[in-house]
Amino acid sequence: IQSIRDDTHKRNCKQLAQKFYEFVKEKKIKKVFLISRWTYYTDGEYNGRQFAHITSKDNIFQSKKNSRNSFNIGLKNTIENYKNINVELYFFHQVPMQLFSAKFAYQNSFDKINNSVDQDKLNNISVDFEKNMKLQSFVRKKVNIYKNKESSFNTIDLNEFFCEDKKCLIGNKNFSFYADDDHL
């Protein structure tokens, strides 16, 4: 799978993935962790922007459909390739992407009278669980298909840590979980 961008001659994802696979194989590594902001390649952000199209072919045709098909092909091939060398895969579902940066959220949740963060305001600014799940629905659907078929393919769902009571929290009174809207 390759990102569709102008600098693929310098930053070739396909070559990097192959090089990493050979490294794992050579070093006889038994567990590999797959971590990314997956929707960056399948859906973009909540508004559909910030989308990095990918392709499974050597073409530059950009579309959401092509990127999603390529993601599925890449996931399937990755699982098969690592299974063939007896490597257990751990797929981390992406952390909930927030609507606002951590800085903005804390500035707008700060109670000047009490000189502290108002947790209720912070919770209200945090992304809704359903909105988060809707954005991730395509990736989760594809991942679950393989999870149910392959015993060497495991998933770790970070929503269990970040989400509660219909919200995926950006942080608490003492600290933010995020550096911005989508990086921990």
Indicate where each model-derived feature is located:
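Extracellular glycan-modifying ectodomains
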Residues: 1-184
